[in-house]
């Protein structure tokens, strides 16, 4: 059976999309190949033809997912930034990590990842701070806003009682 010309590109995109959602929901190290290919709707062979290692898949996931977050915050003036932060800190974002920012879910795994993943992550976080600085008008405030927002989501996901 012959595949269409864009088959490999489509399979790669599906693997990154499904891998990002699964990794943010269950953790990257907890995401097995079988679950990943099932969620992506591709064969096991597709993953091995697209990525030389699981670390390479992590790099692709970090780049795609964090780039989306950077894009969501880019060009937002103070009022717009407040709306985006309100969404970021919302119960919906906390309850559905698969559809949100990768930092609260994957930050601790990135800290244990290879140097390439960490450098990629660091560069994208700096871009995120650059984007936040537009709305905060001060770099230190942008870093504080980022840290507090991520911490808020991590805590919201970790505690059982919403009144805590």
Residues of each region from the PLM?
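N-terminal intrinsically disordered/low-complexity leader segments
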Residues: 1-10
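C-terminal peripheral helix-coil segments that are non-catalytic and often amphipathic
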Residues: 2, 86, 90-94, 123-139, ...
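Helix-turn-helix
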Residues: 14, 18-56, 60
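Amphipathic alpha-helical interaction segments
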Residues: 56, 83-87, 105, 123, ...
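Hydrophobic alpha-helical connector segments
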Residues: 60, 70-100
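Amphipathic alpha-helical segments used for helix-helix packing
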Residues: 83-84, 94-122
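Hydrophobic/aromatic-rich alpha-helical bundle segments in the mid-to-C-terminal region
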Residues: 115-122, 134-164
């Amino acid at each position: 059976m012959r595949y269409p010309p864009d088959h490999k590109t489509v399979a790669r995109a599906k693997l990154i999309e499904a891998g990002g959602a699964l990794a943010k929901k269950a953790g990257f190290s907890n995401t097995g190949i079988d679950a990943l290919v099932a969620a992506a709707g591709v064969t096991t062979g597709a993953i091995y033809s697209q990525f030389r290692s699981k670390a390479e898949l992590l790099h692709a996931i970090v780049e795609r997912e964090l780039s989306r977050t950077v894009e969501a915050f880019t060009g937002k003036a103070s009022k717009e930034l407040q709306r985006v932060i309100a969404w970021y800190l919302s119960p919906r974002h906390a309850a559905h990590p698969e559809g949100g920012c990768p930092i609260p879910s994957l930050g601790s795994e990135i800290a244990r990842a290879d140097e390439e993943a960490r450098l990629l992550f660091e560069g994208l976080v700096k871009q995120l701070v650059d984007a936040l600085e537009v709305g905060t008008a001060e770099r230190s405030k942008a870093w504080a806003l980022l840290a507090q927002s991520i911490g808020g989501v991590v805590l919201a996901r970790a505690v059982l009682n919403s009144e805590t």
